[in-house]
């Protein structure tokens, strides 16, 4: 039987300025895991296009281009375009479990359906995928485990970025500036 409801969106006509710069975040495939979007659309842009609204925490799957096969839970409510498939599972299925399953299967899905990186994924391809589900409590426990791991990885990425920034600052301040003979910061015990 059906495990979910799925739909894609669309893009408002870019030639009509009043469809853009509104209050609805416009989520594109590279932004499925982001809490902000580069573009936003207006109510008029939404109603005059096939863009579709999704709630925060909706399972999103990238169908086209370089991001094909990327999966995430939306961090914001917004509208999606045609390059994204929203997947809304029935009550006995966990979004987190499906997200992690799709993440794990990404390379085999790409290899099978996008030979040589050509073409696009589609809702009908996703509907044909076979997922073996444990009980809902086990799905939720598995999903939560990987969500915790993802959060830890994100924290480590932030720590690494901060450390790289600090290194750049020290490199800049511990080397003499142009026209200077001594750096702004010196190690203790060194002078001259």
Language-model-detected regions and their locations in the chain:
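Non-catalytic DNA-recognition/assembly elements of restriction-modification systems
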Residues: 1-10, 35, 186-192
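Short, solvent-exposed loop/turn positions at domain surfaces
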Residues: 13, 47-48, 148
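A short beta-sheet element
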Residues: 22, 28-30, 37-103
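Extracytoplasmic/periplasmic mature domains of Sec-exported, cell-envelope-associated bacterial proteins
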Residues: 107-108
């Amino acid at each position: 039987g059906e495990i979910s409801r799925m739909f894609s969106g669309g893009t408002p006509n870019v030639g009509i300025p009043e469809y853009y710069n509104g209050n609805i975040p416009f989520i594109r495939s590279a932004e499925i895991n982001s809490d902000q979007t580069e573009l936003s659309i207006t109510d008029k842009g939404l109603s005059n296009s096939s863009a579709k609204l999704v709630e925060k925490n909706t399972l999103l799957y990238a169908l086209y281009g370089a991001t094909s096969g990327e999966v995430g839970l939306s961090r914001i409510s917004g509208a999606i375009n045609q390059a994204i498939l929203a997947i809304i599972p029935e009550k006995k299925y966990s979004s987190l479990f499906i997200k992690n399953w799709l993440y794990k299967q990404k390379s085999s899905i790409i290899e099978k359906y996008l030979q040589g990186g050509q073409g696009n994924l589609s809702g009908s391809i996703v509907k044909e995928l076979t997922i073996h589900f444990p009980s809902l409590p086990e799905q939720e426990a598995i999903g939560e485990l990987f969500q915790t791991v993802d959060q830890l990885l994100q924290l480590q990425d932030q720590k690494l970025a901060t450390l790289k920034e600090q290194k750049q600052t020290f490199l800049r301040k511990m080397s003499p500036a142009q026209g200077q003979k001594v750096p702004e910061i010196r190690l203790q015990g060194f002078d001259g």
